[in-house]
Each structure stands twice: as structure tokens, then as C-alpha cells.
Amino acid sequence: MEKIFLNGEFVSPSEAKVSYNDRGYVFGDGIYEYIRVYNGKLFTVTEHYERFLRSANEIGLDLNYSVEELIELSRKLVDMNQIETGAIYIQATRGVAERNHSFPTPEVEPAIVAYTKSYDRPYDHLENGVNGVTVEDIRWLRCDIKSLNLLGNVLAKEYAVKYNAVEAIQHRGETVTEGSSSNAYAIKDGVIYTHPINNYILNGITRIVIKKIAEDYNIPFKEETFTVDFLRNADEVIVSSTSAEVTPVIKLDGEPVNDGKVGPITRQLQEGFEKYIESHSI
């Protein structure tokens, strides 16, 4: 029987209930992580939970969990649910309290829930590429925190769906930031460009992996801003995330990227990613 982790216990889905006064439900006052499972093993799990605890610290949320403890509960959940290929979603909120914008006084216990999902890798997208669109980035100014406040992302993703695209690549003015659920890259003249790490983007775990792969393959990797026009005229465009892995974008705003085919640097990064899965899953 499927199990859900809820506030220190492994329970059935029917028992996994939260209060209507949970601050995650009322305010989006919480954080989350999404961790890939390959061959029954957790991929880059340490990096994910280090970011999880950083996000918690940034919003003043003390979870009383170490990285090691979070990894252990994740392993148990994956084993219980017999997940071979899929993911684990975990979120923490500031807990249950009467509705008030300020933090609860006295403090209440955080609410933590985690569940698993079995699903295959996006082979078709990886092999053939996807359509993308560009859209104005209307999100808040702390995108480096992986918070539950995702309305801006949701609206951007829905815009992509409306125009038969898989991802919306966002921009503030003319400066490209990131995708609605991914980091974004423009490849030009053999160089990978992506937005620098700051409060405008999430420091994606797959982004970190791609940077390391680029170093291994001696591909120049520049963390600097670029424009929407630069993106549209790139030789290759990719988006990356835990679920999307290294996905090529072959059409942007209805026009082909370069010749509309998956490019050679994208293929190198995908090759390196396969090796990284083997070496960084535990």
C-alpha cells in the first residue's frame, strides 16, 4: 500500500490530512523540493536537501531536520512505495495557526509532507526537442527561494500550454531569467550562456550539474545575462530541471531555433548527464 510521510509518520493517503488553517494552504508560507529517482536511487539528493534547508532558513523556518535525516526518510519512502523511476516531492510549511499575516506567536510546529510518484523519463522531449514561448517574468523578487508561492510560474506555464508549447521562458524587460519550471540557456558560437545566480532565478540542481558537465567537456559556460533577441538568435536553446533533465528547445515563439534540430552541444550535455546519473545516485 502506498505511504505518505506526514509530520514524522508514514501513513496511507487516506490518512494524510492537513488543516484548513495550515499556513501553506492559507498563505503559501512554505518551501518544497522535487527529487528524481533513477533505478530506485535518489539523484543529487544531498544538493536538493541542502537547498531545501537554505530555503527554510531564508524564510525563518526551523525544521529541526538535518540533511542526513531528510535523506533517510526519503529512502524509506521510496523503498516503501517501490519507486524504480520517478520522483519524491517534499514540502514544509510554517504549520497550523489562526490566520494572521505575521508569524505565529508562540511558534507552532512546521508541517512536513512527502510523497512519491512513478513516471518515466521524458525520452521524446530529450530526443526530438520541444516548443517554447517567451513571456514577461511577473514573479516576486526572491526566486532563489524554492517557495510554495508559484502563481507567477503557473500563469507562465498556462501561457505556454495555450500556445502549444512545453515551456515558457521568462524575461524581465529584455533580460531572460529562466523558465516557468526550469533554468534556461542560450548556446552561441560554442559557448553556453545562462543567467547568473541571484534573486531573480532559482539555482537549479540540474543547472549545477550542467555547469559541471560543461567543465568536463571543455565547453565554455558563461553565467551572464542575455536578451530575448539573443535567445531567439542562438544556435541552440535548452531548458533544464529535475523533471525535464536537459531538454532542447527547437522552436521558440513559433519560429525554429537555428535549423530547428537538436544541436551538438545539447547532445554532449545529455551524454554527460547520463554519466552523472550513474555517479551521483545513492
UniProtKB/Swiss-Prot annotation:
Cofactor: pyridoxal 5'-phosphate
Gene Ontology CC annotations of this record: cytosol
GO BP: any one term: D-amino acid biosynthetic process
EC number: 2.6.1.21
Coiled coil among keywords: no
CDD domains (UniProt xref): D-AAT_like
Reactions the enzyme catalyzes: D-alanine + 2-oxoglutarate = D-glutamate + pyruvate
Binding site for pyridoxal 5'-phosphate: 51, 178
InterPro entries (UniProt xref): Aminotrans_IV, Aminotrans_IV_CS, Aminotransferase-like, BCAT-like_C, BCAT-like_N, Class-IV_PLP-Dep_Aminotrnsfr, D_amino_transT
Residues with PTM N6-(pyridoxal phosphate)lysine: 146
Annotated GO MF terms: D-alanine-2-oxoglutarate aminotransferase activity; pyridoxal phosphate binding
Active site: 146
Keywords assigned by UniProt, alphabetized: Aminotransferase, Pyridoxal phosphate, Transferase
Top-level taxon in the UniProt lineage: Bacteria
Residue sites binding substrate per the record: 32, 99, 101
The UniProt record lists the keyword Transferase: yes
Function: Acts on the D-isomers of alanine, leucine, aspartate, glutamate, aminobutyrate, norvaline and asparagine. The enzyme transfers an amino group from a substrate D-amino acid to the pyridoxal phosphate cofactor to form pyridoxamine and an alpha-keto acid in the first half-reaction. The second half-reaction is the reverse of the first, transferring the amino group from the pyridoxamine to a second alpha-keto acid to form the product D-amino acid via a ping-pong mechanism. This is an important process in the formation of D-alanine and D-glutamate, which are essential bacterial cell wall components.
Family under the similarity heading: Belongs to the class-IV pyridoxal-phosphate-dependent aminotransferase family.
Record-linked NCBIfam families: D_amino_aminoT
Subunit structure: Homodimer.
Record protein name field: D-alanine aminotransferase
